[in-house]
C-alpha cells in the first residue's frame, strides 16, 4: 500500500511554497516559486493574482515530481496565505478586474483616515476587533470598486467576487465551483463581526460594499471542495484546511492553550497570543482576531502586526546591496562590537502595532564616521527585535500576563544572533520551532484533521518537536538603555513625517 501524505500550499507575499508532510508531521518535499510585486506609486504594493495562481500550479506539479509522489497519495490539501491582500474578479471569466492590493499597501490610507474622521473607528473596533487601517481588506475593496469603471454596478448585480488569497486559490483549484473563506481570513477584512461570526451589514453599508460579492465563511478544518481532475492528473483531492498565515503558524506551534504566544518572522513579524474562547478587545492598539474555529468552537487571539521584518533584510540585499543573502546578516552582526548607537527604523510602509502610523517613513539614527557595514546590518536586525518587544510589552499590558516564553518561527528565526538579541532585549526565553515552516505545517494539520489523517489535537501534540532555546543574558541596565534609544528613534522618525517634502520634485 502506498504511503499517504498531506499537501500544504503556503502562499506568501513574495513567493509560493507547496510542501508535502508525512504522518509524523515531517516535511517530505517542497517546491518554491517567487513572483513579482508591483509598486505603481510610492507606498503602493500590488500583485498580479494570475501570477500567484501560476506560481501555485507550478509548485504543486514540481513538488509531486521531485518527491516522486502520485496525486492519489495526497489525502488532503491545506491552504495558508498572506492575509488581507484583496482580489476582485469576474465571476464568469475568472479574471481579476484589477491587481491584487497587498496587505502592505498604503494606497487606501485616505479612506481609512476618513472613516476615523467620521467617528467610525470605535464601531469598527467593537465589531471586528481591528483598528481602522488601510492594512485590512475593506478599504481595498472600496478602492477597487471606485477606480475600475463600472465595478460598483457590476458588484451590485452579482457579477464580481471578492476574496483574500485563500478564497482565490480555492476558487481556482475547484474550477470556480467554490467561493469560500475561513474564520481567520474573514476576521482580517475589517468587514467580519467576530462576535456573531457574520459579515457585518453595518460596515458593509458604511462602505457601500455589496454582500453578494463576499464568500461564505467556514471553519478552519472541513472539506470545502475538491480539486478539478484536470489540475492534478485526474485526482480529485479534498481541500480541507485553511487559515491565514499567522493563525496557521499559531496552530502549527501547538499554541492550543490560552496565554500561549508565538512570533513569526516573515516579510513582516507577527506576535499572536491565544486568548481562548472569549474575545478581549485591546486597550493599546493590538488586534483582536480569530485564532481558529474547530468543531463549532472559536478560539480568539490577540495580535501585534509589524509591517517590516524579513523585508528589511531584502532591502539590505536588493536595495542597499549591503549583503548578498539574508544568512550573511548573522555573520556581519557578530562582527559589530559595541556599536549599538545606530538605530534603523524600517517604517518603509508606515509603522504597525502598537503605533498604527501610516505616514512615518524609514529612518536611520546615530551614524558616525566610524559606522561600518556590519554596524548598519546589525542595527537593521536589531530593529526586528525592538519592534517585536514593542508588541510583547503591549501584549503583556493588555492581557495582564508575564509571558516568560515566546515560540518563534519563520525565515528570519534561523538567525541565531537575532534570536539571542530578541531574548535579551525582551527578557523572555525564546523557543525556536524544530521546523521553521510552522505556517505550512499548521495548514497541513487543519487539513489532515478534517479527513481523519490525524485524529485530534492530542495526536498532534504527540508528534510536536521544538528546536533551540535562547535564554536572556543581557544585564537589565543595558537592556533598558538600548530600548530607550529605540523609543527615541521612533519618536524622531515620527517627528520627521511632519516636514513638508515633495518626494516627486526634481532637482534638475
From Swiss-Prot:
Its EC number is 2.7.1.30. PROSITE patterns: FGGY_KINASES_1, FGGY_KINASES_2. It comes from Lactiplantibacillus plantarum (strain ATCC BAA-793 / NCIMB 8826 / WCFS1). It comes from the Bacteria. The keyword Protein biosynthesis does not apply. This is Glycerol kinase 2. Homotetramer and homodimer (in equilibrium). GO terms for biological process: glycerol catabolic process; glycerol metabolic process; glycerol-3-phosphate metabolic process. Glycerol binds at residues 83-84, 135, 245-246. It holds the Pfam family FGGY_N. It catalyses: glycerol + ATP = sn-glycerol 3-phosphate + ADP + H(+). ATP binds at residues 13-15, 267, 310, 314, 411. GO terms for cellular component: cytosol. Gene3D superfamilies: 3.30.420.40. Belongs to the FGGY kinase family. Sn-glycerol 3-phosphate binds at residues 13, 83-84, 135, 245. Pathway: Polyol metabolism; glycerol degradation via glycerol kinase pathway; sn-glycerol 3-phosphate from glycerol: step 1/1. Key enzyme in the regulation of glycerol uptake and metabolism. Catalyzes the phosphorylation of glycerol to yield sn-glycerol 3-phosphate. Activated by phosphorylation and inhibited by fructose 1,6-bisphosphate (FBP).
